[in-house]
């Protein structure tokens, strides 16, 4: 806006900031809008307010880092069980970001980064734990499949593509990406194919482990914004991986036999001792895991050395699977109930139906990952028929429905029943 000065000290038609009232002569820059003006000082003040609000988002302590107890409380809302793994992860993540928060304050002692290895059976929640952690800390997160990675120069993905995905999740903000979390799934599939080093080159196994060593420990990675192999002439972005937290996960099928057989002396003949088979569950055996077992499995010692924190997860029993179906904030039962609510229909499950679904998942040895496919199969016909039916108020699923002995029970509203009686 412009004002006419009567005092004679200010020239006529002087422009003023609409927010702080300073004149154009008191500030460096005055930006014009359709009907208002804003000065550079007010713009900087607004930016400071926005930055402070962004910093205060999420659960933060006075140091800007959530405590392990706060992390576990949020994890409990989404992930059922796995108390030991949650404790290990919450402490590791808290220490990692506390290290970053105090890095610039005291350079006398340099704290090393501690990456994490998650070991557990299929469908026990390894991937979901990592995803939930990234959401709690509010940092960029990306997930990579180790089975698609190969050494540079071979068909497949370079390990630098992992950093590219992290950069994309941070909207190409290099500073944010350098504080992110990378989860590498199926890391057990890049184990060495044999105990002894092979004469032929193992480009998808040991070769990938060797390629991952540097970015996991900390290096300046040259990342091509559009992917390396299709656009070789493009400029590279420099990303420091020193402060990126790497979490690796895998099912490690067969590792339990290596752990159980550790220290056994084999003998033959009549004097041979026969040891009873280990009847513990896989998750319980994993609690006795030592780094030497991973070396026997096929991971190279240098790779294991980059993963000092090992968290083992237990296989899920029926009670845990039933709780996974119904208790978390985004439980499967709640998801399907919400889906049915869109048709104005209430969906209910008997307790024995949930146990039958959990039992099917255990029989298939798919863990929590297999629950959705079982639910889809049970509700397929109902979801097909429901949009064309009128007056259905409620659908009830019993254990007989899960086992294929009966159809879901449809309960109609009274008005539809009255219409049917009149027409009859």
Curated annotation (Swiss-Prot):
<dbReference type="InterPro" id="IPR038366">
    <property type="entry name" value="Znf_CppX_C4_sf"/>
</dbReference>
<feature type="binding site">
    <location>
        <position position="39"/>
    </location>
    <ligand>
        <name>Zn(2+)</name>
    </ligand>
</feature>
<dbReference type="InterPro" id="IPR003593">
    <property type="entry name" value="AAA+_ATPase"/>
</dbReference>
<feature type="binding site">
    <location>
        <position position="42"/>
    </location>
    <ligand>
        <name>Zn(2+)</name>
    </ligand>
</feature>
<dbReference type="GO" id="GO:0009376">
    <property type="term" value="C:HslUV protease complex"/>
</dbReference>
<dbReference type="GO" id="GO:0046983">
    <property type="term" value="F:protein dimerization activity"/>
</dbReference>
<comment type="subunit">
    <text>Component of the ClpX-ClpP complex. Forms a hexameric ring that, in the presence of ATP, binds to fourteen ClpP subunits assembled into a disk-like structure with a central cavity, resembling the structure of eukaryotic proteasomes.</text>
</comment>
<keyword id="KW-0143">Chaperone</keyword>
<keyword id="KW-0479">Metal-binding</keyword>
<dbReference type="InterPro" id="IPR004487">
    <property type="entry name" value="Clp_protease_ATP-bd_su_ClpX"/>
</dbReference>
<dbReference type="GO" id="GO:0051603">
    <property type="term" value="P:proteolysis involved in protein catabolic process"/>
</dbReference>
<dbReference type="InterPro" id="IPR050052">
    <property type="entry name" value="ATP-dep_Clp_protease_ClpX"/>
</dbReference>
<dbReference type="InterPro" id="IPR019489">
    <property type="entry name" value="Clp_ATPase_C"/>
</dbReference>
<dbReference type="GO" id="GO:0016887">
    <property type="term" value="F:ATP hydrolysis activity"/>
</dbReference>
<dbReference type="Pfam" id="PF06689">
    <property type="entry name" value="zf-C4_ClpX"/>
</dbReference>
<dbReference type="GO" id="GO:0005524">
    <property type="term" value="F:ATP binding"/>
</dbReference>
<keyword id="KW-0547">Nucleotide-binding</keyword>
<feature type="domain" description="ClpX-type ZB">
    <location>
        <begin position="5"/>
        <end position="58"/>
    </location>
</feature>
<keyword id="KW-0067">ATP-binding</keyword>
<dbReference type="GO" id="GO:0140662">
    <property type="term" value="F:ATP-dependent protein folding chaperone"/>
</dbReference>
<comment type="function">
    <text>ATP-dependent specificity component of the Clp protease. It directs the protease to specific substrates. Can perform chaperone functions in the absence of ClpP.</text>
</comment>
<dbReference type="InterPro" id="IPR010603">
    <property type="entry name" value="Znf_CppX_C4"/>
</dbReference>
<dbReference type="Pfam" id="PF10431">
    <property type="entry name" value="ClpB_D2-small"/>
</dbReference>
<dbReference type="Pfam" id="PF07724">
    <property type="entry name" value="AAA_2"/>
</dbReference>
<dbReference type="InterPro" id="IPR027417">
    <property type="entry name" value="P-loop_NTPase"/>
</dbReference>
<dbReference type="InterPro" id="IPR046425">
    <property type="entry name" value="ClpX_bact"/>
</dbReference>
<dbReference type="GO" id="GO:0008270">
    <property type="term" value="F:zinc ion binding"/>
</dbReference>
<feature type="binding site">
    <location>
        <begin position="121"/>
        <end position="128"/>
    </location>
    <ligand>
        <name>ATP</name>
    </ligand>
</feature>
<protein>
    <recommendedName>
        <fullName>ATP-dependent Clp protease ATP-binding subunit ClpX</fullName>
    </recommendedName>
</protein>
<feature type="binding site">
    <location>
        <position position="17"/>
    </location>
    <ligand>
        <name>Zn(2+)</name>
    </ligand>
</feature>
<dbReference type="GO" id="GO:0051301">
    <property type="term" value="P:cell division"/>
</dbReference>
<keyword id="KW-0862">Zinc</keyword>
<comment type="similarity">
    <text>Belongs to the ClpX chaperone family.</text>
</comment>
<dbReference type="InterPro" id="IPR003959">
    <property type="entry name" value="ATPase_AAA_core"/>
</dbReference>
<dbReference type="GO" id="GO:0051082">
    <property type="term" value="F:unfolded protein binding"/>
</dbReference>
<feature type="binding site">
    <location>
        <position position="20"/>
    </location>
    <ligand>
        <name>Zn(2+)</name>
    </ligand>
</feature>
